Amino acid sequence: MVIPKEILSDFKELYEKANRLVEEESRNDPPTDPFRSHYKARDVLIVLKKQLDDQLVSVQASEEDGGQDDRCYHSLLAFVCRDLGRIYIYTEEQAEGEKMLNRCLELVTPFKECPEGIIPFIGAINELSIVLASKEEYNKGLEILLEAEKIYEDFKASGLKPLAIQDVFNPPEEGQQSHEAGPKELESLYTLVSFYMAQMYGHLGEPEKSAKCCHRTLHRQLESKTYDPIDFALNTATLSQFYIGEKRFEEARHHLAAATLIMAEYEVHMLEPEMSEKQRQDVSETFKHRYADVARCWAKYGLYLMNTSKLRLMRDEDDEDAKNLEIVLRNMRLVEAEQSRFPGLDLTACENRISCEYCLTFDDAKLVFHFVNEWLDIAKDYYKAENEATEYSKIMQDYAEAYEHIAFFEENPENQAKMQKRRAKYLEDLLDLLDPIFYMKICRECWYGAGTAHAAVMDVRLDIIRATSTPAPEDIKKVNQSCMKAIKHFESYVKSYLVKPPSEEWRPNMDVEEQRHMLYAHFHIGRIYYKLISGHPLQQLEHLTSCHTYYQRFDAGCQLHKEAAETLQGEIGVVREMLQLLPLKINTIKARLNKAGLTA
C-alpha cells in the first residue's frame, strides 16, 4: 500500500473524530436529543466518504500501481460505509443503514478473504443480520451469517493476518511486526456471528443449533475475557434452561455452575473505591437482582430433575423400548456434554453440590429437595410480594412444586399427607394475597394445584381408613375436610372459566390445554363428591347427586371438546360406567328415604 502518509493521516483524523463522538461523547447526550453525537459522527463520516470516493476515482483513472492503492481505498471506504450503516440503524434510519451496509459488501466482496477485506465484510454482515431479524427475515439472516462463518474459517486456515482500520491507517514500517488490532477484532466479530446465528436458529425453531451457537459464543467470550460478568451469568443460566428441557442435566448443571462462579468472582471486586454511594447501591442492587435470577434457574434445575425422576419411575418397568432409547440417548449425550463445557473454569466444587443423575430413592430426592429450597430462599430474599407480586408468586409456586415432588418419593403415608398439605398451604397463602381480577392466571394455577394437593391428602386418609376395620370418627372427619377443601378450590377454578355463573357455559377462546384442565377439574369434583363419607342418607344422596352432575358435565364437555379429551380416555371410561351406576345408587337411597318417611 503506497497511499501517502499525509493523506492517510487526514483520513485517520476524521475517522477517529467520528469514533470519539460515538464511543465517548454520545454518553453525555441529553434525553431530549439522544442521537446528537451520532448525527455529528455521521456528518464527519459522510465528509470522509466523499474524500475517499474522490480519491478512488482518481486512483482508478491512473492505475499506476497495479491496483494496490485501489484495494486500500476500497477497504477504507468499506469500513466507513459499515460504520455509517451502523449509525443510520442506531438513529432509526434503517433503509439508509441497509443501503450503506450493502455498499460496504459490494466494495469488499472481490477481496473478502484478504486481510484488507475480511473485517469490514463480516462486520457489515453482522449489522445486516440485525436489520433482517427486525424484518423477520430469519432465513435470509441465517444465510448471510453462515457465509460469514465459512469466510472466517477459510481465512483462519490461510494463516493470513486480518487488518483492522487502525492497521490500514498505520501500516508497519519495513521489517516491523504487523499490528495486532486486526486479529482481535476479527475474533470479536466471529463471536458476534455465533451470537446472531443463535438468535436466527431460535426464531427458526431449531433450538439445538441455537444452543450450540449460544454455548460457542459464551465459550469464546470467556477465552477472550470480553464479557460482562452479569450478562455472561444470565446468558449461561438461561442456556441451562434449554438443557434442562432436554433432560441433559449434566450440561445444565455445568452452565449453572459457570454462572454461579462468574457471579461469585465478580462480587469480590464489583465495588470500587472511587464509586459514589449511589453507584455502590446501584451495583449491589443489580447483583442481588441477577443472583436471584440465577438462583431461580438452579431451583428449576432441581424441580425438573425431581419431576423427570418421578415420571421415569412411574413408567412401565417392562417398557424395554423406552429403556433402550434411554441408553442410546445417554451414550449420545456423553459426547454432547463434552462439547458443551467451559474447559477454562474449575467448576468441580460447585457441580458437586448437586447430582445430575436421576433420583431413585427418597434419600436421593431429599438432597435435591433441600438444594431447591436453599436457592428459592435466596430468590425470595430479593423478590418481595409488595413490589414484585408476580415473581414472588412464581417462587411460592416453586416451593409448592418441590413438596409435590418429594411427596412422591416419601413412603410413609402420614408424611406424604403432611407434604401435600404444605404444598397446599403455599398455594392458599398466595390466594389470600392475590386479587384474581389482576392475577387470574396465577390464581387459576393455585386453585387447581391446591385442589389436587387436598385430593392427594384425601386419598392417603382413605387408604388409612381402609386399612382399619373400625375407623375413628376423627379419621373420617379428616377425610371429609380434605374433600371439601379440594372441592372448594376446584369449583373456584371452574367458575373462573364460566361466562356468567351460575350458567355452565364456558368462556369462548379457551385453548386446548385450558379445556383439558377444565375437564379434569370436573372429573376431580365428581370423584371427590363420591368419596365423601356420611352415615346419613340425605347427605349421601346430596353427594351422589353432585357427583352425577359433575360427571355429566365432564362427559358433555368431552363430547364438545374432542381434541382436549383425546388424552382422557381412561377417565371417560370410568365416568361413563359411573353414569350408569349412579342413578341406581341414587334411586336405592331415595327408596330407603321414602321407606323411612324422609323426603329426598
From Swiss-Prot:
According to its UniProt entry, the protein's GO biological process terms are: central nervous system projection neuron axonogenesis; microtubule cytoskeleton organization; mitochondrion transport along microtubule; neuron projection maintenance
Its GO CC terms?
cytoskeleton; mitochondrion
* Tree of life domain: Eukaryota
Q: Does the keyword Phosphoprotein apply?
A: no
InterPro entries per the record? KBP (IPR022083), TPR-like_helical_dom_sf (IPR011990)
**Sections of the chain in a coiled coil:** 384-434
Q: Where in the cell is it found?
A: Cytoplasm, Cytoskeleton
Query: Per UniProt, which keywords does this protein have?
Result: Coiled coil, Cytoplasm, Cytoskeleton
Q: What is its main location?
A: cytoplasm
The family classification in the record reads:
Belongs to the KIF-binding protein family.
Name of the molecule in the record: KIF-binding protein
Q: Which organism is it from?
A: Drosophila melanogaster
